[in-house]
A protein has these predicted regions:
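Pyridoxal 5′-phosphate
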Residues: 1-276
Length: 276
């Protein structure tokens, strides 16, 4: 839309992964219609204080959209006390549902347009989408099997507790951070604060080891799967100075163990020492 000249887009970024509130305030103008924010960065794992940002956006008269792709399931989001107008998240990440599932919360202030028209299984006498949510945005046959799988995932997360799941993953990452801090060759991309982090950590690799080659070596020789490259987020890598090669991202889950981390760190040591 910005390329077509329909809207004016302003990006607010931070090198350490934590957005400065004053930077957001300074970027807003009387004509600002929407502020969109990723709650937890998929590259760095850093978590933004949406509880502080949301009232500021509301006071400016703009709508507030939160991308909770990396936070839903591991970070509490209180829609009753936090003025959020849109909250979007997929089901296949920390909610452990099937791919192709997700949800969009639409607050009472937001008035979206129907993005498609079709049968809803009710109110068939109306030629357009029903006014009632969520049917207004859900034309066509719903993904019943996907929703059932997502519900099972949500129940699993609820039984264990989002904070317990997050803490387990962050504790494993803390072991990696400790190893990196003792290394002369490796660096953690962005800031590290275990209390404001989810289970993703990017490593800036030594100059002689492209991230893609490291990821391939980890996979082929140690059966370890990590993500290398730009992680669908080129702008943050430009800010980090890791563009165009990107970083090596580690994202342990609830089934990962300390032994898994030990194997990962041993593998990095062997690869960078030239053993392989």
């Amino acid at each position: 839309m910005a390329d077509a000249g329909t809207i004016t887009l302003t990006r607010v970024a931070s090198v350490d992964g934590y957005i400065d509130l004053e930077s957001i305030r300074a970027a807003m103008t009387p004509g600002t219609s929407l502020v969109a924010l990723t709650q937890a960065a998929n590259v760095l794992g850093t978590v933004q204080p949406i509880e502080e940002i949301a009232p500021m956006v509301r006071a400016a008269g703009a709508l507030f959209l939160v991308d909770a792709a990396q936070s839903a399931g591991v970070w509490p989001i209180d829609l009753k006390s936090t003025p959020i107008d849109f909250l979007a998240f997929p089901g296949h990440k920390a909610l452990y549902g099937p791919t192709g599932t997700g949800a969009l919360y639409v607050g009472p202030r937001a008035k979206p347009r129907a993005w498609r028209e079709g049968g809803t299984g009710g109110d068939s006498k109306t030629p357009t989408q029903p006014d009632q949510m969520p049917y207004f945005l859900e034309g066509g046959t719903p993904n019943v099997l996907g929703v059932a799988g997502l519900l099972a995932g949500i129940r699993w997360v609820s039984e264990r507790g989002p904070e317990a799941l997050r803490r387990h993953e962050v504790d494993l990452l803390a072991k990696v951070v400790d190893w990196v801090e003792k290394s002369d060759a490796w660096k953690v991309a962005g800031a590290w604060d275990a209390d404001r982090h989810v289970g993703a950590l990017s490593l800036v690799v030594p100059d002689d080891f492209p991230p893609q080659e490291l990821a391939l070596a980890l996979d082929s020789s140690f059966d370890i799967a990590v993500r290398s490259g730009l992680h669908c987020a080129p702008y943050i890598h430009q800010r980090l100075g890791t563009f165009p090669d990107g970083t090596l991202r580690l994202s342990p889950g609830p089934f990962s163990t300390e032994q898994d981390i030990d194997v990962f760190l041993h593998a990095l040591t062997e690869i960078t020492a030239g053993v392989l």
